[in-house]
Amino acid sequence: MDKKQSRLRRGRQTRAKIAELKVIRLAVHRTNLHIYASIIGPDAKILASASTAEAEVRKELAGQSGAGGNVAAAALVGKRVAEKALKAGIAEVAFDRSGFRYHGRVKAVAEAAREAGLKF
């Protein structure tokens, strides 16, 4: 089993546990260039989302080297998704890291979302 298959397996296990609880989750996906965060309801509908691919985020990150793929950009995405969730009336979520290690950009999204008022 290679690294990608292992990550996908871990992600499936996490999603299965969250699905049993029927709670809203904050799902994070990471690529080399961007990071994506979505608030997903128990019925698999996306309630709020933010990413470094959004035009508003790109404007805020303009001028930085590696603008979409760094910890500062991930923190901005975490803050934005938390603000959108709170505006939609969502205060508590389960964190779905999609099999990625809780380190670096994934950790930055989670910590920024917590600081912005989202409870895990």
UniProtKB/Swiss-Prot annotation:
One function term, GO molecular function aspect: structural constituent of ribosome
Gene3D superfamilies for this protein: 3.30.420.100
Pfam families in UniProt: Ribosomal_L18p
GO annotation terms (biological process): translation
Keyword rRNA-binding (UniProt): yes
Subunit: Part of the 50S ribosomal subunit; part of the 5S rRNA/L5/L18/L25 subcomplex. Contacts the 5S and 23S rRNAs.
Free-text function comment from the UniProt entry: This is one of the proteins that bind and probably mediate the attachment of the 5S RNA into the large ribosomal subunit, where it forms part of the central protuberance.
Identification of the protein by name: Large ribosomal subunit protein uL18
Gene label: rplR
